[in-house]
Swiss-Prot record:
This is Large ribosomal subunit protein bL19. It comes from the Bacteria. It holds the Pfam family Ribosomal_L19. SUPFAM superfamilies: Translation proteins SH3-like domain. It comes from Blochmanniella pennsylvanica (strain BPEN).
Length: 116
């Protein structure tokens, strides 16, 4: 039974997911259905946490929109996600960047890593 579930989950996993790190600035394109229309929506922000659990892996992206912090959790292997693009590589010393929630302005900046 366990092998059956494992095989099914492996078939469902996406192969083209980039290797994300906390502190990276990413652009996530997702499909949004509004009424009868289907369109791509872009969410760009900093990866503040990553949870690696096989098919159930997820990552949290945070951005500041109109002065308010917005966080969104994406399932890595979701069929709703069209593309994940890394815009900038960040240098941080923590695995979870939850402390960014209480920072704003220049103190919330993350150093840029030049080579991936």
């Amino acid at each position: 039974m366990y092998e059956l579930i494992n095989n099914f989950e492996k078939k469902q996993m996406k192969k083209n997911i980039p290797h994300l790190h906390p502190g990276d600035t990413v652009e996530v394109k997702t499909w949004v259905i509004e009424g009868s229309k289907k369109r791509l929506q872009i969410f760009e922000g900093v990866v503040i946490s990553i949870k690696n659990r096989g098919l159930h892996s997820a990552f949290t992206v945070r951005k500041i929109s109109s002065g308010e912090g917005v966080e969104r959790v994406f399932q890595s292997h979701s069929p709703v996600i069209e593309e994940i693009k890394i815009k900038r590589f960040g240098i941080v010393r923590r695995a979870k960047l939850y402390y960014l929630r209480s920072l704003s302005g220049k103190s919330a900046r993350i150093k840029v890593r030049m080579n991936p």
